Regions:
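Non-catalytic substrate-recognition/targeting regions of SAM-dependent transferases
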Residues: 1-6, 23-92
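Rossmann-like S-adenosyl-L-methionine
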Residues: 66-171
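Carbohydrate-binding surface patches
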Residues: 11-16
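Non-transmembrane, interaction-prone segments in cytosolic or luminal domains
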Residues: 10, 48-50, 62-63, 155, ...
Length: 171
């Protein structure tokens, strides 16, 4: 796709990945803000795929300004997303339904211990704890992602002793 847009609370995060969307970026940005009623759009056009289109990487506020960390609510869980950092637009929103399904699965089968490999910022770890897991081990090669995963556990009121974060390469 040439355009990816995610909404995190009061902030849009967008990737303009093709020459066509780049050409119309200002118009697209204005229309997105008009359609959503928001005032902030952070551009995360820093993907290597832009080079295939002859475009340089770009990241920063396209419209508005302010802190890049946003707190969102997914199901009953609170999560923080930094639209300036991390993968893609900042978080894997497309996994929202899977995180809910995973919490329900943990609850249904009574899983007590969960290993979350490639955990990124711990969305599935929070889901496992919300589903009733007694302990979750989260593994990722990114230390900053694990810091955020730990903060998500505490942000949702879970005992941090029920969560272990391991900085390691699962491969």
């Amino acid at each position: 796709p040439g355009l990816i847009v995610d909404r995190y609370g009061d902030t849009l995060s967008a990737q303009f990945l093709s020459a066509g969307t780049e050409r119309w970026k200002a118009t697209i940005a204005d229309l997105l803000l008009q359609a959503t009623g928001l005032a902030r759009l952070y551009e995360r056009s820093d993907s290597g795929v832009r080079k295939l289109e002859g475009l340089e990487p770009v990241a920063g506020w396209l419209r508005g300004s302010g802190p890049t960390e946003v707190t969102i609510t997914e199901h009953d869980w609170r999560l923080t997303v930094d639209v300036a950092e991390g993968h893609k637009t900042g978080f894997y929103l497309d996994q929202r339904d899977n995180r809910r399904l995973f919490a329900d699965t943990v609850r249904h089968f009574g899983y007590q211990r969960v290993l979350n490999c490639f955990c990124y910022t711990g969305g599935f770890s929070v889901a496992a704890l919300a589903g009733g897991a007694a302990h979750v081990t989260s593994v990722d090669s990114s230390a900053p992602a694990l810091v955020r995963a730990n903060s998500h556990v505490g942000l949702n009121g879970f005992d941090v002793a029920r969560h272990e974060a391991l900085n390691a390469d699962v491969n």
